[in-house]
Design a protein with these regions (language model features):
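Membrane-interface alpha helices of multi-pass inner-membrane proteins
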Residues: 158-159, 194-225, 230, 261
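Hydrophobic, aromatic-rich transmembrane alpha-helices
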Residues: 2-10, 427, 431-436, 452-479
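Short hydrophobic/aromatic helix or loop-helix immediately within or flanking a transmembrane segment
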Residues: 64-110
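Transmembrane-helix motifs of polytopic, lipid-linked glycan transferases
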Residues: 117-138, 464-467
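Start-transfer (signal-anchor) and selected internal transmembrane alpha helices
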Residues: 1-49, 256-258, 538-540
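Transmembrane-helix signature of polytopic, membrane-embedded enzymes
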Residues: 113, 130-153
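Membrane-interface helix-loop-helix junctions at transmembrane boundaries of multi-pass membrane enzymes
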Residues: 136, 190-202, 243-244, 445, ...
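Short acidic/glycine- and proline-prone juxtamembrane loop motifs at membrane-interface regions
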Residues: 162-169
Length: 540
């Protein structure tokens, strides 16, 4: 071991180089890596090395990215043929389709490789956020640099970096939000009013930018992020109170902090009004937009057999069906299982759906009824309502994904505050340690088996890295910023366990949250080792 640590000239050289790089150069380094590895996946790895996993256009066979690619091309053609007034940020409620179609239409290239630079910008920014956040705890720049690398280079991140997935927006947006919060914390300790105002203004800008990115991809997570902002405000309030008792903050600084907090809360909770504005361009509650293209032979056949109105325009446009009954009948034929149609009509409740589809299995409604939320008598109404929404999302997920290979805890109900709390230990276990070793070789398909092996290697690294968390807890237990990072990790790791009980979804949703713990753990181990080296030199 001594020989290993005494022969690290290359590592020492790299550390010196990192310490001399500013954030812009580090971001460029992260960006270059992201672009190169994504293009390698799309242009070389999939078509040449793993052709059995390749469906074309540099995309994996199977996944939401196929749908986003298809409709991105359709909407891009609509824009090119009819003008940019036909572009919407969230066509049919899918923000990622709006982004993809805009890029495709602007460049006139309908291949996913043109998206790589845009996705890489966000991924590199997310990694840089972790670097700055960990450095704010007082670790060296080189330590922070190496601690953020797992987020940048873990193979699972290639899924949303090289394919078309919403996670590239939400994961990096959440880290941008966290960076804004950390900067806000640091602004409190600034002596200059001007410096404080500048820092807090940047923090507010970052938080609002993150909310907008979340709005583009997953609008339902805006409210979730607003709840975490409340947690941030609570921790910040405690820090302000300690500064007041210590007489370590001026009245002007305190007043501006309160004003900034109120502004963030107001904007965060009113950004939903933007969502409502863009929803006007989405599917009307009484209309269903069904795209009919030449390749959709099955759908075209159904339309012809039922003598329904339709319009075929080369993969470019579609026809609006104005009656819910007709839409449901079509969906029944397109999907072999009637319950699949429910995925496209979330505004309906179970009983109204049953009226339109009489042959829908009754047992599913009985199960849904038994899982309905039971109001709590001891919690504030606002908290109870938010918990009920998570329970509804969980039920909705089970309704359509119960057959998925990695869905878990189907028989566990969390339909009351008591059950919600009792489930917490299990949620922590799954949120931070799943998939478990027993699940690493549970898949039979080649594609899933490859992904399981990749995730298994990542989990081994994560398990080892977690050993440093106890050290981190001891070193930074008195820092408010540290507890903000812990709150962030807990919040965004546990929420998907409650709302999306599927390992595949969990691995993606929790990625930023679990990488914060990994970064803290690695930073703590490095910090401890550096302290030991310094003490040995002092002793000599």
């Amino acid at each position: 071991m001594k020989w290993f640590f005494s022969n690290f000239k290359i590592i020492t050289f790299l550390i010196k180089q990192v310490n001399n790089l500013n954030n812009c150069y580090i971001w460029l380094l992260f960006f270059a890596y992201s672009v190169l590895v994504s293009l390698f996946i799309q242009l070389i790895a999939l078509p040449l090395i793993f052709p059995n996993l390749h469906i074309g256009n540099g995309l994996l066979d199977g996944g939401d990215w196929i749908v986003y690619q298809k409709y991105g091309v359709i909407m891009a053609n609509v824009i090119i043929d009819n003008g940019w007034e036909n572009w919407y940020l969230r066509p049919e409620g899918f923000g990622i389709v709006g982004v993809v179609s805009a890029i495709y239409a602007f460049f006139g290239i309908f291949e996913p490789y043109i998206l790589v630079p845009f996705f890489s910008v966000l991924h590199a920014l997310g990694a840089l956020c972790i670097l700055i956040i960990t450095q704010s705890l007082g670790v060296s720049r080189s330590t922070a640099f190496f601690s953020c690398l797992p987020y940048l280079i873990f193979p699972s991140s290639l899924l949303w970096l090289s394919q078309i997935l919403k996670d590239v927006f939400t994961l990096n947006a959440s880290l941008i939000m966290l960076l804004g919060m950390v900067l806000f914390f640091g602004a409190i300790d600034k002596k200059s009013i001007k410096s404080q105002i500048i820092s807090q203004s940047i923090a507010i800008f970052l938080i609002l930018t993150s909310l907008f990115l979340i709005f583009i991809s997953r609008p339902y997570m805006i409210e979730l992020s607003s709840i975490f902002i409340l947690i941030f405000e609570f921790i910040l309030g405690i820090k302000l109170l300690t500064r007041i008792f210590q007489s370590n903050i001026s009245l002007i600084n305190f007043a501006f902090c309160i004003f900034a907090q109120i502004l963030i809360l107001f904007l965060a909770f009113n950004i939903n009004s933007i969502e409502k504005h863009f929803a006007a361009y989405s599917i009307n509650q009484n209309e269903y937009h069904v795209y009919i293209s030449k390749s959709d032979k099955e759908i075209k056949k159904i339309f012809l057999e039922r003598n329904l109105p339709m319009q075929i325009i080369e993969e470019k446009a579609g026809k609006i069906i104005n009656k819910k009954e007709l839409a449901l009948e079509i969906l029944k034929d397109i999907y072999k299982k009637p319950k699949s149609a429910l995925r496209l009509i979330p505004s309906f409740n179970a009983e109204s759906i049953k009226n339109y589809i009489p042959d829908l299995p009754t047992i599913e409604f009985e199960t849904y009824e038994s899982r309905k939320w039971q109001n709590s008598a001891f919690l504030p109404r606002v908290v109870d309502v938010q918990m009920s929404k998570v329970n509804d999302q969980r039920n909705y997920f089970y309704l359509h994904q119960y057959h998925a290979n990695t869905t878990f805890d189907y028989d566990v109900e969390i339909n009351s505050a008591i059950k919600f709390i009792r489930y917490l230990p299990r949620a922590v276990q799954v949120g931070y340690f799943a998939p478990f070793p027993t699940d690493w070789n549970s898949s039979k398909s080649n594609k899933a088996n490859l992904m399981h092996k990749v995730i298994a290697l990542e989990m081994i690294f994560i398990y080892l890295a977690f050993s440093g968390f106890i050290i981190a807890l001891f070193i930074w237990r008195k820092k408010f910023e540290f507890w903000l990072l812990i709150a962030f990790s807990l919040f965004y790791s546990l929420f998907p366990v409650y709302a999306f009980p599927n390992i595949g979804a969990l691995v993606r949703y929790r990625y930023a949250a679990i990488m914060i713990i990994v970064a803290l753990s690695l930073s703590a181990i490095s910090y401890l080792y550096s302290s030991k080296i310094k003490s040995n030199h002092s002793y000599e």
